[in-house]
Amino acid sequence: MIQKNKNFATAKAKSIRVSPRKLNLVASFIRNMKVSEALVQLTFSPKRIAKIVKDCLQSAIANAENNLGLDIDRLIITKATVGKSVVMKRIMPRAKGRATRINKFFSNLYITVTEKEDN
């Protein structure tokens, strides 16, 4: 069943093994971009996390096309938000019998694509 009253689709990627600060660099880069241009930029980005962001964006495009029947040539990325997820705590042995804590951060990514109206 295709709903035509909504003109936006979302996708999310949860518990990504990267800090929110690093993920936000890529998310802010693609915000307010056409999806075709964003896919090209993410394909050739040197950032390690760009592949996961690209997969999430392709999921949002597929949701827009298959669930809502939107035209993928007119889609733009309206929201690309990053949130904190769990923090995995680890121990690193140090000198003289001491130990320090290592925090391994995880992130959540939410992408919303909207069909641009013709004016």
Curated annotation (Swiss-Prot):
Domain of life: Bacteria
One cellular-component annotation, GO: cytosolic large ribosomal subunit
Pfam family, one: Ribosomal_L22
One GO term of the biological process aspect: translation
Keyword RNA-binding in annotation: yes
InterPro entries with a match to the protein in the record: Ribosomal_uL22, Ribosomal_uL22_bac/chlpt-type, Ribosomal_uL22_bac/org-type, Ribosomal_uL22_CS, Ribosomal_uL22_sf
Keywords: Ribonucleoprotein, Ribosomal protein, RNA-binding, rRNA-binding
Keyword Mitochondrion: no
Single GO MF annotation: structural constituent of ribosome
Homology family: Belongs to the universal ribosomal protein uL22 family.
UniProt-listed PANTHER family: CHLOROPLAST 50S RIBOSOMAL PROTEIN L22-RELATED, LARGE RIBOSOMAL SUBUNIT PROTEIN UL22M
Subunit structure: Part of the 50S ribosomal subunit.
Protein role: This protein binds specifically to 23S rRNA; its binding is stimulated by other ribosomal proteins, e.g. L4, L17, and L20. It is important during the early stages of 50S assembly. It makes multiple contacts with different domains of the 23S rRNA in the assembled 50S subunit and ribosome.
Name this protein carries in UniProt: Large ribosomal subunit protein uL22
Origin species: Rickettsia prowazekii (strain Madrid E)
